[in-house]
């Protein structure tokens, strides 16, 4: 049986790396992409379980041409493409009144534009091949709630959520392409956690906001992602699954 193949953008660290590792353990071919070539190669060495299983592609998701090249390279490496995980992201804490135009544009371009460019490139391939693929996007609970200090990311993630639902309807009905999203809460060993926990006060606030009283792990996100990519989830489309320990039920976003 031919092994399935997935592309994971931002796949060399945090949740992206965990998802890449999980799919590799399940026997999938995996392409990890990002801007740091050395980090990509290191990830490849760590997660590969057989020769030729993992490929690296250095790119910037803000480029639509790079997104197209990414798809071509994955198909060249594996002979097929079955799924795309749009994990590349950019974020930083900044009061809205102090946010610069460049800071705003950078996050919007990476998170929203990048997600669309990569999704479009993958869908064009599947449509041409008359294949039913799967897209998984990374959202955030503040996409429908609120998050002081992350207006740029909140706006971008809200766009990703709307994009997810719209493409699920449009491409799902026309081509059988499934599109879903995951909205993670505070996850340990990620860039987001490092930014949030710059002080003990910030850490305490976050921990108190999660009913389960702990952070999530990249491995838990990876397990959910693996399910959503699997045939067992073939009737899930246009949904956003929250994995935040119940934090969204509390009054504080982080």
From Swiss-Prot:
One of this protein's Pfam families, by short name? Answer: adh_short_C2
Enzyme Commission number(s) from the entry? 1.3.1.34
Listed binding positions for NAD(+) are 157
> Residues that bind NADP(+), according to the entry?
6-38
Pathway assignment:
Lipid metabolism; fatty acid beta-oxidation
Its recorded reaction(s) are: a 4,5-saturated-(2E)-enoyl-CoA + NADP(+) = a (2E,4E)-dienoyl-CoA + NADPH + H(+); a (2E,4Z)-dienoyl-CoA + NADPH + H(+) = a 4,5-saturated-(2E)-enoyl-CoA + NADP(+)
User: Record keywords: Oxidoreductase included?
Assistant: yes
SUPFAM superfamilies (alphabetical):
NAD(P)-binding Rossmann-fold domains
List keywords of the entry alphabetically.
Fatty acid metabolism, Lipid degradation, Lipid metabolism, NAD, NADP, Oxidoreductase
Tell me where the transmembrane regions lie: none
In the record, biological process GO terms are:
fatty acid beta-oxidation; fatty acid metabolic process
Tell me what induces its expression. Repressed by FadR in the absence of LCFAs (fatty acids of 14-20 carbon atoms). When LCFAs are present in the medium, they are converted to long-chain acyl-CoAs, which antagonize FadR as to its binding to fadR boxes on target DNA and thus derepress transcription.
* Single GO term (MF): oxidoreductase activity, acting on the CH-CH group of donors, NAD or NADP as acceptor
| Active-site residue numbers | 142 (proton acceptor)
Q: Which residues are noted in the entry as substrate-binding?
A: 100
Q: What does this protein do?
A: Auxiliary enzyme of beta-oxidation. It participates in the metabolism of unsaturated fatty enoyl-CoA esters having double bonds in both even- and odd-numbered positions. Catalyzes the NADP-dependent reduction of 2,4-dienoyl-CoA to yield trans-3-enoyl-CoA.
Protein family? Belongs to the short-chain dehydrogenases/reductases (SDR) family. 2,4-dienoyl-CoA reductase subfamily.
Q: What is this protein called?
A: Probable 2,4-dienoyl-CoA reductase [(2E)-enoyl-CoA-producing]
């Amino acid at each position: 049986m031919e092994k399935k193949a997935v592309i994971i953008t931002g796949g060399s660290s945090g949740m992206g790396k965990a998802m890449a590792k999980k799919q590799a353990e399940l026997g999938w071919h995996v392409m990890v992409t990002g801007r740091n070539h050395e980090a990509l190669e290191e990830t490849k060495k760590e997660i590969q379980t057989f020769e030729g299983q993992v490929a690296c592609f250095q790119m910037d998701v803000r480029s639509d041409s790079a997104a197209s090249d990414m798809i071509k390279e994955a198909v060249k490496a594996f002979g097929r493409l079955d799924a795309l995980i749009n994990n590349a992201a950019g974020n930083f804490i900044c009061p809205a009144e102090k946010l610069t135009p460049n800071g705003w544009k950078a996050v919007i371009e990476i998170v929203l534009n990048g997600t669309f460019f990569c999704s479009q490139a993958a869908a064009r391939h599947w449509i041409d091949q008359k294949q039913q693929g799967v897209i998984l996007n990374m959202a955030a609970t503040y996409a429908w709630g609120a998050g002081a200090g992350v207006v740029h990311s909140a706006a971008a993630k809200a766009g990703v959520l709307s994009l997810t639902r719209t493409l699920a309807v449009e491409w799902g009905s026309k081509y059988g392409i499934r599109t879903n999203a995951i909205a993670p809460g505070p996850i340990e060993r990620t860039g987001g956690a490092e930014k949030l926990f710059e002080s003990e006060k910030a850490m305490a606030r976050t921990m108190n906001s999660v009913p389960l009283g702990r952070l999530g792990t990249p491995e838990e996100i990876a397990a959910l992602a693996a399910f959503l990519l699997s045939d067992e989830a073939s009737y899930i489309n246009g949904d956003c699954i929250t994995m935040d320990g119940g934090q969204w039920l509390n009054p504080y976003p982080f």
